[in-house]
Amino acid sequence: MTNIRKTHPLMKILNDAFIDLPTPSNISSWWNFGSLLGLCLIMQILTGLFLAMHYTPDTSTAFSSVAHICRDVNYGWFIRYLHANGASMFFICLYAHIGRGLYYGSYMFQETWNIGVLLLLTVMATAFVGYVLPWGQMSFWGATVITNLLSAIPYIGTTLVEWIWGGFSVDKATLTRFFAFHFILPFIITALAAVHLLFLHETGSNNPTGIPSNMDMIPFHPYYTIKDILGALFLILTLLALTLFTPDLLGDPDNYTPANPLSTPAHIKPEWYFLFAYAILRSIPNKLGGVLALLLSILILVFIPMLQTSKQRSMMFRPFSQLLFWTLIADLLTLTWIGGQPVEHPYIIVGQLASILYFFLILVLMPTVSLIENKLLKW
């Protein structure tokens, strides 16, 4: 008799996705991050659900309800910090996953890649609206500054901003709708992730060499299930260490002050995972220009497959491209650092140079160097 997992309509889908899936035999630990992102998503939905049971999305009680969760709810502090630091782990995995895709040429699976970019934007939106919910100073002013960027859109900008706010400033209506968005978006992310996986399984996984591996595949289970479990243990260990020893390491002290529209914090800045984009936004001394640069800094990922000039898919055998890739990573780290600094000399000029380098590397240097490497192949 055939095993039920191969015949049952539902089990068959799971079987083909996680058990009998033919997988390249040589994929490295950089391929772990997909499953880790799935784990992060499940953890965030569960911790978020329990937080939502005690949270009140109202300006007069939101801050107090978060304090109540931390003080009076059984293990409420633990759930709250797991959720806050879980977001950081989510973005670490997300950036590692994208970096892997860029390095090994996974972006040549265009449908998978484009849905991935859509997922990135959705996760960023979810994190942004989530950061507003505790209704601390940085929540309020972050929401004010970022939503205000839409006013740079010609003609309809101001109307659009007031429509999103639900009034003439960030207030009750804004908080309520942001809570609604924050609740629904993770389920949209889950659906998108399923489609992401569907498209990936149409082609099969890429591998470090970038060479088709159809002749050398192994079943996902037990080889990669055990490998993913190891990655998951590392992730959980890191998250628990962060949550139990330094829960506020990545947060902003300003968010422990209740939101006050009459007093602006000295330095308004987003969470660490948005700092690189924030630095690019600030590096252009024009509102519309900054907003466009901010958008392009993320949407540039959509154009990566079109900028592929190399005859080789992966960077594994391309030392010059590798050098530029790691320069790009260093540049992004520099932008992240600059995004957290005040707007003064020398940070302004460093941020502007790093922003120019970011776009120059992706749009000019990397495609050019790939062409040079193609020539070197003939030597």
Swiss-Prot record:
<dbReference type="Pfam" id="PF00033">
    <property type="entry name" value="Cytochrome_B"/>
</dbReference>
<comment type="function">
    <text>Component of the ubiquinol-cytochrome c reductase complex (complex III or cytochrome b-c1 complex) that is part of the mitochondrial respiratory chain. The b-c1 complex mediates electron transfer from ubiquinol to cytochrome c. Contributes to the generation of a proton gradient across the mitochondrial membrane that is then used for ATP synthesis.</text>
</comment>
<dbReference type="GO" id="GO:0045275">
    <property type="term" value="C:respiratory chain complex III"/>
</dbReference>
<keyword id="KW-0679">Respiratory chain</keyword>
<feature type="binding site" description="axial binding residue">
    <location>
        <position position="196"/>
    </location>
    <ligand>
        <name>heme b b566</name>
    </ligand>
</feature>
<feature type="transmembrane region" description="Helical">
    <location>
        <begin position="320"/>
        <end position="340"/>
    </location>
</feature>
<keyword id="KW-0408">Iron</keyword>
<feature type="transmembrane region" description="Helical">
    <location>
        <begin position="226"/>
        <end position="246"/>
    </location>
</feature>
<comment type="subunit">
    <text>The cytochrome bc1 complex contains 11 subunits: 3 respiratory subunits (MT-CYB, CYC1 and UQCRFS1), 2 core proteins (UQCRC1 and UQCRC2) and 6 low-molecular weight proteins (UQCRH/QCR6, UQCRB/QCR7, UQCRQ/QCR8, UQCR10/QCR9, UQCR11/QCR10 and a cleavage product of UQCRFS1). This cytochrome bc1 complex then forms a dimer.</text>
</comment>
<dbReference type="InterPro" id="IPR048260">
    <property type="entry name" value="Cytochrome_b_C_euk/bac"/>
</dbReference>
<feature type="binding site" description="axial binding residue">
    <location>
        <position position="97"/>
    </location>
    <ligand>
        <name>heme b b566</name>
    </ligand>
</feature>
<feature type="binding site">
    <location>
        <position position="201"/>
    </location>
    <ligand>
        <name>a ubiquinone</name>
    </ligand>
</feature>
<feature type="binding site" description="axial binding residue">
    <location>
        <position position="182"/>
    </location>
    <ligand>
        <name>heme b b562</name>
    </ligand>
</feature>
<feature type="transmembrane region" description="Helical">
    <location>
        <begin position="178"/>
        <end position="198"/>
    </location>
</feature>
<dbReference type="Pfam" id="PF00032">
    <property type="entry name" value="Cytochrom_B_C"/>
</dbReference>
<keyword id="KW-0999">Mitochondrion inner membrane</keyword>
<dbReference type="GO" id="GO:0046872">
    <property type="term" value="F:metal ion binding"/>
</dbReference>
<dbReference type="GO" id="GO:0008121">
    <property type="term" value="F:ubiquinol-cytochrome-c reductase activity"/>
</dbReference>
<keyword id="KW-1133">Transmembrane helix</keyword>
<keyword id="KW-0349">Heme</keyword>
<feature type="transmembrane region" description="Helical">
    <location>
        <begin position="347"/>
        <end position="367"/>
    </location>
</feature>
<dbReference type="GO" id="GO:0006122">
    <property type="term" value="P:mitochondrial electron transport, ubiquinol to cytochrome c"/>
</dbReference>
<dbReference type="GO" id="GO:0005743">
    <property type="term" value="C:mitochondrial inner membrane"/>
</dbReference>
<feature type="transmembrane region" description="Helical">
    <location>
        <begin position="288"/>
        <end position="308"/>
    </location>
</feature>
<feature type="binding site" description="axial binding residue">
    <location>
        <position position="83"/>
    </location>
    <ligand>
        <name>heme b b562</name>
    </ligand>
</feature>
<dbReference type="InterPro" id="IPR016174">
    <property type="entry name" value="Di-haem_cyt_TM"/>
</dbReference>
<dbReference type="InterPro" id="IPR027387">
    <property type="entry name" value="Cytb/b6-like_sf"/>
</dbReference>
<keyword id="KW-0496">Mitochondrion</keyword>
<keyword id="KW-0479">Metal-binding</keyword>
<keyword id="KW-0249">Electron transport</keyword>
<feature type="transmembrane region" description="Helical">
    <location>
        <begin position="113"/>
        <end position="133"/>
    </location>
</feature>
<dbReference type="InterPro" id="IPR036150">
    <property type="entry name" value="Cyt_b/b6_C_sf"/>
</dbReference>
<protein>
    <recommendedName>
        <fullName>Cytochrome b</fullName>
    </recommendedName>
</protein>
<keyword id="KW-0812">Transmembrane</keyword>
<keyword id="KW-0472">Membrane</keyword>
<dbReference type="InterPro" id="IPR030689">
    <property type="entry name" value="Cytochrome_b"/>
</dbReference>
<keyword id="KW-0813">Transport</keyword>
<keyword id="KW-0830">Ubiquinone</keyword>
<feature type="transmembrane region" description="Helical">
    <location>
        <begin position="33"/>
        <end position="53"/>
    </location>
</feature>
<dbReference type="InterPro" id="IPR005798">
    <property type="entry name" value="Cyt_b/b6_C"/>
</dbReference>
<dbReference type="InterPro" id="IPR048259">
    <property type="entry name" value="Cytochrome_b_N_euk/bac"/>
</dbReference>
<dbReference type="InterPro" id="IPR005797">
    <property type="entry name" value="Cyt_b/b6_N"/>
</dbReference>
